Amino acid sequence: GSKTAKANVNLSTADFALDHYVAVTTEGQSAGVEQLFAADFNQKIQASNAQNHSRNGVVKLLKKQKGEKLNCTVSTDIIEESADYRIAKVTLKFENFTKTDLVTLERVGNDWKVSKSINSYK
């Protein structure tokens, strides 16, 4: 069998998936990172030099940050949702700046996955 045991993360609802995404991106959680992101996941960073990150790059980075808690206040707003689709705005307030992450979640089979993330800073 494979050496890395699959962490069993419950992604059966959009709420669970979104909570897990926040835990992974802000609290250094690394369990179930692979399951969380859709195969075609893409991350865009809106900045003076806009960047695009593939699924592999983001998964790698998040695994590297395992255990690192960001020093910020997190708030989540649901912008739009349907039975198979949800867009949420995750706001990370740091001392000197705010990061806004627009997250798109989609139902894939029985699980919810993050398919897109657009970050901006102010």
PLM region descriptions:
Residues 40-42, 93-95, 120-122:
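Solvent-exposed loop/turn segments at secondary-structure junctions
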Residues 10, 53-97:
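Surface-exposed, charged secondary-structure patches
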Residues 28-44:
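Short, well-ordered alpha-helical segments enriched in acidic and aromatic residues
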Residues 1, 98-122:
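Short beta-strand edge/turn micro-motifs at domain boundaries
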Residues 42-51, 67:
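A short gly/proline-enriched turn/hairpin at secondary-structure junctions
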Residues 1-27, 35:
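Short, low-complexity N-terminal intrinsically disordered segments enriched in polar/charged residues
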Residues 17, 74-75, 101:
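Hydrophobic alpha-helical segments typical of transmembrane helices
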